[in-house]
Amino acid sequence: MEYNKLLADMVPGDRVEGFYILKEGAIKTSNSGKPFLSATVTDKSGSLDLKAWDYSGPVGAPTDAGKVVKIRADVTEYRGSIQLTASNVRMATQEDSYDVSALVPVAPIDRDETLEKVRSLIASMEDRDYRVLAETMLERHLETFRSIPAAKSVHHSFLSGLLMHTANMLCLADFLAGQYSQIIDRSLLLTGTLLHDFAKEKEFTFSQLGVVTDYSRKGQLLGHLVMGAQEIAQVAAELGTPEEKSLLLQHMILSHHGEPEFGAAVKPMFAEADLLSQIDMLDSRMEIYAETLPGVPAGTFSSRIFALDKRIYHHE
């Protein structure tokens, strides 16, 4: 029996016991009519599916997502994927002792240095209206911006993921603004890039460890695009930002998913909005590669990745 082994290090045949985060889980009924737990557990190294047969609780309520559980399980393989077959699953208690830093994945960045890079790029914007709006909203969102994940599961779904994702995008935006300077307003592009996901702090609910557990009521009814555009309109009005500049930024937020089928309220209708959408897609997709490839042996293909709608190849 191995204790608190990282999920990424587990191989079929291992017997493990330890503490992990319940990402999601539900009690279901098998074909034979017996209850079982179907769940996903995570730690800082990744995630694995878990099954506990002939199991009716206590773990499995919707409110359990994001909490720490203790499991005892065999590591097995099913249809080419490693999973856990648990003989015991319970909620962690106050009497239990576990290392939180081993459970929660954190962005591989220096947060202070990355935030300073963001501040420097914003301070370098020539347009005062955009610069003041960007700096004002950054200060209002600072604590959550530097700490929350960028997504629930698809990309940058670790602590400080939003900071990492946004900083990456700002560097790309800065370069591309110079590359296409004849048509790109750099200050507009950088401001839209900074603000594009700020409303995710309202879109998600978070566990006590800071992990995204679900979409909030507002997140489901409105989404971060609409809430983000609404806040920009409000703050711009407070600051006296010209209406045209506020409108351009709102459009960038509402359109940054590119196509309605991907959640955009409208399609991008000017160069900076289109470029923001492309930059967002680029960094998101590259992060999916970065998170997937370490688990794919060189010279082989991954399983199908839903967000990419394909398998990917890990070349030598």
Label the predicted regions.
Residues 83-149:
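Extended, charge-rich, solvent-exposed interface segments
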Residues 20, 66, 169, 253, ...:
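Divalent metal-coordination and catalytic microenvironments
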Residues 38-43, 206:
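Short, acidic/hydrophobic/Gly-rich beta-strand patch recurrent on exposed beta strands
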Residues 277, 294-295, 299-316:
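N-terminal intrinsically disordered, cationic/polar leader segments
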Residues 130-174, 195-199, 203:
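A short mid-domain helix/strand-loop element embedded in enzyme catalytic domains
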Residues 25-35, 48, 55-101:
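OB-fold single-stranded nucleic acid-binding module
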Residues 1-16:
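OB-fold nucleic-acid-binding modules
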Residues 154-156, 164, 175-296:
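Divalent metal-dependent catalytic cores for phosphoryl transfer on phosphate-bearing substrates
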